[in-house]
Structures are given as C-alpha cells and as structure tokens.
Amino acid sequence: MRPVVADPASDAVFWPEGFTLAGINCGIKPTSKDLMLMLCDEPASTASVFTTNLCCAAPVELSKAALSASGGKMRAVICNSGNANAATGAAGMQNARLMAESTAQAFDLNAGEVLVASTGVIGQQLPVEKIAGAMPSLKATSGSTQWCDAAEAIMTTDTFPKAFGVDVKLSGGTARIAGIAKGSGMICPNMATMLAFLGTDATIEPALLQELLAAANAVSFNAITVDGDTSTNDMAAIMASGKGPEVLRGSDNARLFGEALRSVMTMLAQLIIVDGEGATKFVELRVTGAKSNEEARMAAMTVANSPLVKTAIHGEDANWGRIIAAAGRSGASFVQEELSVYFDDEPILKPGLDANFSEERAKEVMSKEEFTITLSLGKGAGRATVWTCDLSHGYIEINGSYRS
C-alpha cells in the first residue's frame, strides 16, 4: 500500500509526551532549515542503530561511544543538514564534540547525554561555529509539537518532510510513538537506516528498547532501497520519556509496543521510497517460495537494487528476464524452471519458463504509480518483502550536480 504523507495538523499524527523539538536555519544552508533538536525532559531510555559503512562519519563514531558510555540513557539529539562531517579526520571529530558541548551548555545537559548526527556533502569541514551561535534561536523556537519543523531541518534532497506517529493501547494506559526521518538518495541501509529519530512516552528499559528497535528496523528501514548506496551517516535512534505505561520483557505490552513501533518505522521507510530521488513509481517487491527468509531477502534486495530492473520499471517494460537474472546472482537457491513472476495479480512468468503473458495487461499494471512484483522461487516457505522505486533521468539530474 502506497503510504500517505502525514499532515502535521491532522489528528492522525500523535506526538508523545515529554519531548521538546525545534528546527531552524543556522546558516549552513542559505535559507532553509538545517539544524534540528530533539530534547527529552528527563534522562530517557535510548536505543540506536548505525551505519555499517567503514567510512562512517565523525558524529556516528561519537554517538556510538556516548550511547555505550551512558548505559542507554540520553537526553537529546542534535542534527544538522547540509554538511555530513564525514571523511573530515580529527578536526571533524572535534567539531562533532563541539556540537554536543554547545547543545549541552544551552540546555543544561551533560555533553555525554547528547547524540550527534549530520547529513549532507561528504569531505567538507563542518562550520560548527554557526551551530553554536544558533543555540539561542533553537531554544527560543522549541516546543512539544514542532516535530514537522524538526523533520524539515534534517532534509537534504528530500522534497517533503517525513513525520508520522501512532497511539498504542497498552495495559496501564495509552502510549504514543512518533518519528521523523530523512532520505531520498544514498538509500540502501545495512543494519542501520538513513536518519530517523523517534520518541515514545512509554516506560521501557534500554536493553528491551534496543531489541525492539533492531527487530523493527530489519523489516522497515533495512527493507528499502533507492539506489543501492549505504550512507556514511546512517542512524536511527529512539528515546523513551517514561511518561506513559510500562513495557516489560515478555509481556503483551512488549508485543503490542513492538508492532506499533514497526508500523511507524515502516511508514517512514515507505515515505523515503515515495520521495526517492527522481522516483515516479513505488514498488513493493515480494519474494516467496525461498529456502529461508534470509535467502528470500537476498533475492529481493538484489532485484530491488538492479539498475536494469529499476529502469525497466520506469520505462514500463515487462522485462521479466532482468528480474530472474538479478535473482540468479543473489546467492538464493532455485531452479529457473520453477520460477514464477507476477505483476500485481497478472502472471508474467509461469513455471517451466512459460512467458506467454499479455503485454497489454502487463503495461496496464506498470503504468500505475504503485504496483507489486512477486517472484516465487519454488523452493520452500521463505519469504521477504522490500520496497523500491524506479530509476529515472531525474535521479541523474539530481546527483550529477549535488555539490553545486
């Protein structure tokens, strides 16, 4: 199902208690918002996942260390856009520390309680003095409902801010989970995300929160791809303010909370695909009949990342050969004569390499903004679902001049 962009004024958006947010321009970008704060009233149980890229950015290294040293208790996230502070050496690490320190000083925190994130151009030193100088404005404009301002401040090539939240009824009351995310290109996470910051007012221990975040991440942000590139700065973090009902390991509350967290993260992930650089189509790719779920995921991500598949999607060409060729190099086990391919409910390839399909009906499916490709490997019960988009001329236009 194609996700719908959340209206920040709508009752469909639920903001959890115990958080203050802000999004302003600090001067890294000429005019648009480029500095975001998410602050919890009290030390919050915090969990995070980070990029696995070996060229990880200074703020990723700093935030990993801070979260570990804190025992999973943090107070704030500070994030700038327009500059990644990646591949910047010792000076970049010092600038990341200064981001944390200036935030801590402005909001009466310890620097070790601040997660730091950055996104933008790689290899340029961060003008951290602009961030430090903007702290009074950040503080003056902060509030409990400024989630969409915060979402706007972390955008780079995004065309709209991404924010979403839900209520979840638990034993002991109702908890809220909300999040913001950014991402449009360089999207192919690997045990991490792009940038996503979530908050909940549930009461939950850091270790359990980390487990639930990792599980939700595996089927949301780790199940999307725009271009096959894993960023140097990917990070997803969630803070729990403890203002709401308690979530204990092994309880019904833990199951319900985990499902709600997964729904929020899935919506944010799908919004990233909708906003993929130059994208005109949103495609759900399902792989069934694999030997295992892991093999299904291998096949799904390989097909979803294939430039030939993605350009065929853009051109509305039912080139099933590209799909099975991509699956064939994925490492998943199958016999090609047992494969089948469907576009929505329309059979394109049947077992026995029977490709006697209706070009007209296939074109009708592919002309839609949203459709599903199902690839069955015919080997077992393993399955996986990922989301991707087409690859258009617009992607080249955006990325051919990103630094200019």
Curated annotation (Swiss-Prot):
It is an enzyme of class 2 (transferase). Pathway: Amino-acid biosynthesis; L-arginine biosynthesis; L-ornithine and N-acetyl-L-glutamate from L-glutamate and N(2)-acetyl-L-ornithine (cyclic): step 1/1; Amino-acid biosynthesis; L-arginine biosynthesis; N(2)-acetyl-L-ornithine from L-glutamate: step 1/4. Its EC number is 2.3.1.35, 2.3.1.1. The active site is at 193 (nucleophile). InterPro entries: Arg_biosynth_ArgJ, ArgJ-like_dom_sf, ArgJ_beta_C. Substrate binds at residues 156, 182, 193, 277, 399, 404. GO terms for molecular function: glutamate N-acetyltransferase activity; L-glutamate N-acetyltransferase activity. It is found in: Cytoplasm. One of its GO terms (biological process) is ornithine biosynthetic process. It catalyses: N(2)-acetyl-L-ornithine + L-glutamate = N-acetyl-L-glutamate + L-ornithine; L-glutamate + acetyl-CoA = N-acetyl-L-glutamate + CoA + H(+). Its main location: cytoplasm. Catalyzes two activities which are involved in the cyclic version of arginine biosynthesis: the synthesis of N-acetylglutamate from glutamate and acetyl-CoA as the acetyl donor, and of ornithine by transacetylation between N(2)-acetylornithine and glutamate. This is Arginine biosynthesis bifunctional protein ArgJ. It comes from Chlorobaculum tepidum (strain ATCC 49652 / DSM 12025 / NBRC 103806 / TLS) (Chlorobium tepidum). The gene is argJ.
